[in-house]
UniProtKB/Swiss-Prot annotation:
Interacts with TBC1D15, TBC1D21, GK2 and IMMT. Interacts with VDAC2 and VDAC3 in a TBC1D21-dependent manner. Interacts (via ARM domains) with RBBP4. This is Armadillo repeat-containing protein 12. Changing L212P: In SPGF90; uncertain significance. The gene is ARMC12. PANTHER family: ARMADILLO REPEAT-CONTAINING PROTEIN 12 (PTHR47144:SF1). It comes from the Eukaryota. It is found in: Nucleus; Mitochondrion outer membrane. It is a peripheral membrane protein.
Amino acid sequence: MGKSIPQYLGQLDIRKSVVSLATGAGAIYLLYKAIKAGIKCKPPLCSNSPICIARLAVERERHGRDSGELRRLLNSLECKQDEYAKSMILHSITRCVYLLEAEASACTTDDIVLLGYMLDDKDNSVKTQALNTLKAFSGIRKFRLKIQEHSIKVLELISTIWDTELHIAGLRLLNNLPLPDYVHPQLRRVMPALMEILQSDYILAQVQAVRLLSYLAQKNDLLYDILNCQVHSNFLNLFQPTQSGSLLYEVLVFAERLSEGRNAPHYHVVKWHYNEQSLHESLFGEESRLADRLLALVIHPEEDVQIQACKVIVSLQYPQDLRARPSSCQPSRSYFKNTE
């Protein structure tokens, strides 16, 4: 006689349990071996990887000694290298500057000069990495004046090479430096290029470009050049609610500074003439639709954008010089129709 069905099923359950137990035990054992091997595994002693450089920083701090890594990299940059090697060395130097603060501070202006030479390299990736390295060194006060000497060169690169990564690196560097007055003539020449970058489709580059333009809008001798700069017919698309919140915020800051600048007494008294396709006409002209865009941004999901949109509205309705006067004085023109 064969076994009954209940007996057969019972034995089948026992077999399944045994197999599961064995499989689970095997998996646990393999996991134990993997963890044990990982603990015993020693990383390579020397590497240019970010992990290795971070380890050098920890070791230096722990033992209070100079790792020599940054100096070794700078020295290797003076040797003849191909473009790829130079890019990798510069990338490693940048990381070292951020991680090994004491070693970076011990560098000299000669090192900054060496990095400046890299801006003349024929390869755009080398130029970009050199800009990133100079940006890292610009966080150390004693190097700022020396790095400022390269401002004109950086502006030239931004305006003559259409490369998004280079634009981002160059603009980040410029935004981290106080730009001296002697670069203002060059700034006027590159204004159209900055405006083109702002109107491109690369958010990181756009944000850096508009930050620089916002800074320059506070310079009395550059305000007209910015306002009279030619823009695309769809410039106000930058104020659409669908734009990135970070970009919207920076564009609104830019608009507020332009509005305050053009209404300042020393600027307002002059009869300025603007091109029909100028930034001024796009933002503040009779046919501008900026007011509609601003009202839509007042209900934007991001609070920073809401607040900044309100600031621009206030600056348009009540210019700074009029806000300082007695309440009996009214602005000559309103950008917003009366909804009563």
